[in-house]
Amino acid sequence: MEERSKLRYLSMLEVERDTISDVSEKRKFFVTFTYPYMNGRLHLGHLFSISKADFFSYYKELQGYNVLFPFSFHCTGMPISASAKKLAEELSGEKVDLSVKKIIEDLGFDDVKPFTDPVHWVRTFPGLCERSLKRFHGNIDWRRSFITTDINKYYDSFIKWQFNRLNELGHLSFGKRHSIFCPVDKQPCLDHDRRKGENVKPVGVVLCKLRFSEGILLARIKQGCVPSKAVVGSRCDFIGFEYCNEKYFAEKDVFENVDAQASGICVRESVKGDFFGGRRFSGFGKEVVCDAIEKDVPCVVKGTQDKKDPSLAEYIKNEIELISKVESTETQLAETKDLLKFYEPEEEVISRSGGKCIVALTDQWYINYCDPEWKKKVKRCIENLVCTDDTRAILEDGLEWIGKWGFSRSFGLGTRIPWDSEYLIDSLSDSTIYMAMYTFKHFLYRDLEGKDELFPSNRLSDDVWNYIFLNRSITEDLAPYEEILSNCRESFNYFYPIDLRVGGKDLLKNHLIFFLFNHVALFEEKHWPKRMFTNGHLMLNSEKMSKSSGNYMTVDESLDKFGVSSTRMCLAVCGDGNEDANFVESNANAFVLKLYSYVKMIEELCTGRSLNPCILDLMKGYGEMGFADRFLMQTISMNVAHATRAHEDMTYRDVVKYGFYEMVHAKEMYHILGGTNNEILFLLCKAMTQLLYPIIPSLARYLIETYFYSNFSLPVPFLSDTAEIDGVSYLKNTLKRLVAQKRRKKRCEVVEILVGVEYSEWKRKCMSIIDQIACECKVLNINVSEEMKTGESQFVPKIIDAVREVLKEFGIPEKKGILFSMDYLNHPENYSVKFNEYEVLKAHKYYIENNTGLEVIVCVSPRADPGTPLFEFK
């Protein structure tokens, strides 16, 4: 109940706003996210990726940029059509392997019948998703949103222009190709169309021809194996068929692939595996006996390396290698006298329609991503792209792997190929440059579908897009609309290129690499993408998020449960980069309480006080400030620097660490040290709010408007001094060491802390020798630490020889002295104390007394080294 009341309080404070971004004199920043597919509501996995783009857009706004972050909805492809078709079959009484009816009911719809029409999906889920993201308080300009497919005439025309242009540039071709194919949908099945088997590709399989009285049995064979025995499952289904004037028998799964890869096949009969049991066959001139066993096993030839006839084994090996390199023709399979090659999926693939996929030789229109000249340009684009090292490595690997991409489909929603309207353009190919339309969509039409027209849709043609994107002259028929189109062109040239593209890491080898290819092909280099950020999958409570397991949460469920600001804070700390992240509900709950305390802290500080200190005025009095005040000033400045760097790197866990947790800890320590300056505390609260604005914008807006008044922008570090920060770290470390040593004492009431003012004479001499040699190295531009790693340093032996002389002089054990010297050589900063240890400990001995229960006496002693006080318990 406490959490719910505090959540209601936070929600009441949050200030929403509409985001509008237009062409202006300011610097622009254009952020885009890979639009989601519209076959359901948005879930936390979507929101995690979206949050990365949203956080960064607010950050750039703080920096003074004119930020554009638009959002749209992808409807192209077969999943929606397949689900609608499957639902119709389910409602008519057919048995299904996965209930679409239950899925839709679980999404909150009582009447499922309208969903038998694919268009109903397209007109339902985009609106729901938009409402969810508005509740999330995203920094999105909703005027620019749209849906894809030919339902939207503007998008349809835009995609037709894209493919006409690719065709003009010679990037398209037509032919046959082995593709993963869904027999239910009767078309190729891409990764996005699969329920199981993402990234699975066709693989060539070599079969051995085993001849017998009834025909030829096709069996799998291992390379180098001389046939001696065949094994079949007695209950397995086999198909007898005629092909090229021969009668063959093959397992049903093998036959379904073979039948889709060659013409002229005629089915004759079906038999079980026991039909072949006990029969004698001939393979490569050797007699082969067939065993039918009571297991569901593939039909396979077994054997060994034939030592009596090594030439036969070598012949079989060479034949298999040869046929593996031979491609099928458009009508015939690759074969020799004893072998036949076909293709099958390398692993099981199930389409979203529930069909078990095969490999088929299909007519296809292709995008020639294999073009070496095109790849060179994309490589240059990747080299200049700002991204993490692992993202770049995956993109470069994808660039090597990618070849021709079949983009024509016969089933689903989308845009038809302009010159071959029998086919649709696939969903991964119509989603590569749509970000360009964001820059001017609101000048053409107002709604998602293009029904509320500003520019007449009956005037759409390639001439429109050529004018906007290629700076071509306006045609006579478009002259009446030149003002609209001129605004479109101006807006495109102002906002392009994309400054940041955000998406899941699973899209790097398909959508995101296609995105780069198409931008490189269709736009000038000045319009190529500048930065890309990808993230891993999101787990929920340390387990994979899955509807079937019940471990699943939609955006709306999270916002209902934890509110906007707590959900956003939890998303920020889930994880960064391409590693899988983890949304933990207990963390989200905890953020409700933490944010409530944060707001109350500011309310208590500011209520009844007139506080609005100028940083310049505070800095004027910095030299006269006490230890605690200087400590807090330094900590604020340092955390601002760290949090700003984290914002720039998109490592949001660190933003929360330095912008929230470290600030709260600093405030607590400030009070322990006796600090009472409300103006510095006000500065801390304001800096926290500024740094957290990209994460919790609507709550930050309330705090800004209510307490901070001033023009709100990104704070900047204002101090390089860290003496008091070092002093507090020293104080904490001294307490930690003291407590550890106290545990070993039976009874003690008093502790003397012995502080060193300078190092012992032998240490000072060693340090002087090292400083002198290090200075010589610096003059010669030699990195001693790097040389030590390689073991080839010419200066380290010189240092050791000089140090040995000092150790002999003072009678110091050699091992002890050299260890000290090498540590000083590598970490000289650890031996420099920038504050007065004695004064720090004496002024704050109460801190140690309160935490240990001991009376503390601080004194200077030559026995102690600077930075490492000694303890004497009494």
Swiss-Prot record:
Q: Which domain of life is it from?
A: Eukaryota
Write down any Gene Ontology CC term.
cytoplasm
- What does the record give as EC number? 6.1.1.4
User: In which residues does the motif 'HIGH' region occur?
Assistant: 36-46
- Chain residues that bind ATP: 547
MF terms (GO), sorted A to Z: aminoacyl-tRNA deacylase activity; ATP binding; leucine-tRNA ligase activity
Location comes to: Cytoplasm
Q: Which Pfam families does the record match to this protein? A: tRNA-synt_1
Leading EC class: ligase
PANTHER family, alphabetized: LEUCINE--TRNA LIGASE, CYTOPLASMIC, LEUCYL-TRNA SYNTHETASE
UniProt lists the family membership as follows: Belongs to the class-I aminoacyl-tRNA synthetase family.
This protein's name: Probable leucine--tRNA ligase, cytoplasmic
